Each structure stands twice: as C-alpha cells, then as structure tokens.
Amino acid sequence: MTIDLATMTAPATVAPTATPTEDRLPRRFSDFTTLGEALDYAASGVRGLNFHDARGTLVRSYPFAQLRADAHDAALRLIAAGVAPGDRVALVAETSAEFGALFFGAVLAGAWPVPLPLPTSFGGRESYIDQLRVQLASCDPTLLIYPAELAQLAGAAAEASGVTGVDWAAFATRPAPAASLPAASADDVCYLQYSSGSTRFPHGVAVTHRALLSNLAAHAHGMQIAETDRCISWLPWYHDMGLVGCFLSPLANQVSTDYLKTEDFARRPLSWLDLISRNKGTSLSYSPTFGYDICARRISSQTKASDRFDLSRWRVAGNGADMIRPDVMQAFVDAFADAGFQATAFLPSYGLAEATLAVSLMPVGEGIRVELVEETELSGMHHGEDRPQRYRAIVNCGKAVRDMEIQIREEDGTPLPDGAIGKVWCRGPSVMVGYFRDQASTDACLVDGWLDTGDMGYMSDGYIFIVGRAKDMIIINGRNHWPQDIEWAVEQLPGFKAGDIAAFAITAPGGEETPAVLVQCRSSDEAERVRLRDEIRDRVRSVTGMNCVVELIPPRTLPRTSSGKLSRAKARNLYLAGEIKPYDLAA
C-alpha cells in the first residue's frame, strides 16, 4: 500500500476543558487540621486550577484530583532524594502545574517548600542570581528546583550556594519508589514565605498549618465565598497575596481558579479582564493598585469598554499588597463602569506575610471609603493659623478578619484610642511563629503573641486605616512627612506616573536631615530636564514647606521588591552608594 505523506493530516488536538465552577461536593471553609487534609478533600471534587496563555486561551486544566496525584509522586521522589521532615525545598515559583505539584509534594513529604521569585524585567542577570543566593543562604535548602528555561540562572545560584539544583522536568523523570509519608500536625511548619523586603532585608517567615488554615478560613468568611464564585488571578506565586490568597486559599476553600502568568499580564493586562468577562458565574479577583492603574491607562478614551468586556459579575475586586490610592481606583471605575463594573465590588484589605496574609478585610459591598485627615495630624505638628490646611485621603482597609485583633500603640507600647495615629499591632492564630533562624528579628517584632507590623495607622469604629510604613517616614525637625504624600504630589505633574518617584531622607553636608526625591525622567532635552527639576522642587516645597534635593534619573532605575513594589530603602542605599547615577544638570 502506498501512503501519500503530502495529503496526510495530523490528528486534531483536543482543547482542554476548564474545571467547573460548581460542584456537588459540600463546601468546607478551610476547616482542616493540615494543608494535606485540605488537598485530599478538594481532590474528591471536580474543581481545580486552569492555566491560560497571554491571550487568555486555556492551555492546561489541572483538577485538584490530578494535583493530589502528582503531589504524591513528587513527595516520593523527594523522599528518595533524601529529603527529610523539616528540610527546606526551594522552588522557583512559576505559575504552573509543576510548581503546584512540587509545593504540595514537599508538604506531603514533611519538608518546608520555599517559593523563590522569578527574574523581573527591571533586574539584570547578576542581580537575580544574587537575590537567589541571599535567599538560599537564609533558608539552607536540601534542593533547589526550577523551570528548565531558568537552568542557567538558577543553576548558577545553586552552585554558588552549594545547593543541589535540578530543573523540574528532569526531577519528574526520577523514580518514585513507594514510601510512607510522614504524618503532619497542625503546629508543624507548613512552608517558608519570604517577606517582600520593602522596608527590611527579606526574612523567611515560618508559617504553620494552623496559621495558614486559620487565615484561609478567614478569607472565605470575609469574602462570603459562594457556589457561583470563581477566582481569576495574575499575581505571582512567590508573593504572599499570590501564593496564599490566589493558590492555597482557592484550594482549601474548593474554588476553581483561572491563571495568567504575571509576565503575561504585564504584556497584555486587559487579558485579565477578558478572563473575568468570560466567567459566567461570579468572580473573585485581587490586584495591587498598580494593576487597576495599568488597565485604566490601557483602555483608550475612544474605546467603549462594553464592546469588549462584561464586568457586571465581578463580585469581589480586591485591593491590597500596596498603598491603595482612591484616585487610581476612581479612574478604573470611570474607565469600566460602561462594562458593568460596580464600585461596590472593591474590597480593600490589609495584610502581611508575618500574619500569613490577611489582617483586615472590608465588609463585602461597602467598597472604597476614605477619610480626609489634616496633614498636621499625620505629621504630629500643630496647625499654624497662617498656613492653609491640607488634607490627605486615607483609605479604610476594613475590619479585622475572623479571630484577629488589631491594636494601635504608642512607640512605648501604650494602646491608643480611636483616631490616634500610631504603630499597628495584631494578634491571632495566623500570626507567624517567627523568622527562620533569626531569633533577634523575631524578638524585635513579636511580643506576648502580638506582632509589630511596622505600619502606622489608626482605628475608627472597628475599621483600620493605614497611613504608611513606620520605617519609610521622613522626620525633619521633629515633623513627620510621609513619602507617599511627596511622591503623590510629583505624580500629579504631567508626564509622571505611580512608580516614577522615590522619596526618602538623607543627611545634608551640614549634618541636618533633608528630603531627597528621585524622579525617573523620560525627557532627553537638558533644558526640559532643568525645568522639570525646578517644577518638582516647587511642588514638593508646597507640600512639605521645605527645600529638598531633587534628582532626575533614567527610566527603569528605581529598585523594586520581588512583588514589583518600590523599595525606598534600597533606592536610598543605592543613591548614597553612587550606584544610582542622576542626570548632570546645571544648578
């Protein structure tokens, strides 16, 4: 028989089918003893994880049942590789089925998975390798497992750290001989989560099964998770909001989830809204402020949002992970109200890795509420009669989540009444047991079960208002200045946007403290740069009443944390070390 190869057609590939939103399995709000038990229960239903490409096309459906089977095999491979209970297994946290299986595999093996960041577009090869080396030195893992495409970078970090490194495709080919999986208890450490490092060197936060599941239950109760809910996320799994809020919480609360990779969101942010529009049920989706900002900027003023999007079923549009800016959120409402988006869907929140994730959530349906606070109240100074009053909008971040307490304290630890600004402390079952191998830092922030969050805020009728990071505060002549206020003032000038500006304090040649403002400038014309510098200086003086140092720097110069937030502390250190080089401008 003769076969004509030219006329043969390849067999049609079957497109994956997304896991369903609804399930007959009775919903349990994370009422489990261990994360492994939560996985077992979720695997008995039909929901799961769904991975999409940059255009929002489904490329892999991953039911929780398949995740459990793969995690079991991964646990056996880890045990065969010599991984013992309590060992750390470092995993480069790509948003993928492979990472999910390895994360749970480490948990089932009794080890502590340690999610590590992916490279970012604003950092170079050496800075990424150095970042991995620092975190590998901190967590001291038995293995580092990573995607094959990162073999060169992650492999270099592993070799430099004396850690065995392997890509996960190669690891998946290893034998998985039968073995007994260790039993876990609620107070065993479940995983290590590196804090963002926005205001201090990154720490490995030790999170127990009890702490995790308590926080995940608080998510479900706070957001009133319903049968029609589906989660949509682009958040990175190496950040606590992505890992805990959009990977572990949907599993422990049995919610199907649709994912875009973070780098795909950065290229095509409106694909996020496409996924939400396609969901026929109700949507739960979180983003830092900058995610909403990018989408509002991308939609053209000539474009009718309803021609492409249907956001009428977006039930919870969470806000968190950075300072919530009312002006940005209003711009998002203005851009997408035509597509059915309702401002009451916004759900501001407050949290940090040291509390597993959530400390407070706004009650569902209340949206964004702000209070105008006079600048002198924020700075601790009295208002002069000859000085016009200036106000700052402070966002209400909701009420303490279930089983969490929040207190506002003076510097000496004395509790403060409603309306008084002080340090934010919290206490509850989801507060960390401590930083891994760092007792001094643990003792510095944990006192009698209470966690010093490092943030400043005030309470009002049970609601928490966050005004900024204590360590970011600029104190000049005994007066407090919030860098966010200075940065916001500069952002209002034409040509600048959120993330272009970093404000901090430096010591002037005369020994006095003075504000410094670094501004990313896109203009190549020197005369225009001089004009901008002088305009910025005048704007900052109008806000602070002081002269300041203004330096214009090239775009994409300001350092970021692994989650993409501005790192003012690192910007200051790099500037003082001469590693951030401003444009040379005439005085």
Residue ranges and their predicted role:
Residues 315-317, 324-463, 471-473:
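Conserved AMP-binding/adenylate-forming
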Residues 277, 285, 296, 428, ...:
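AMP-binding/adenylate-forming catalytic core of the ANL superfamily
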Residues 148-153, 264, 280-335, 346-355, ...:
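Adenylate-forming
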Residues 49-104, 121-130, 183, 204-213:
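Conserved AMP-binding/adenylate-forming core of the ANL superfamily
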Residues 500, 504-505, 516-517, 537-587:
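Conserved C-terminal "lid"/linker of ANL adenylate-forming enzymes
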Residues 213-230, 240-283, 297-305:
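Conserved AMP-binding/adenylation subdomain of ANL enzymes
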Residues 47, 176-194, 200-201, 215, ...:
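Conserved pre-ATP/AMP-binding loop-to-beta segment of ANL
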Residues 1-62, 66-81, 85, 109, ...:
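N-lobe entry segment of adenylate-forming
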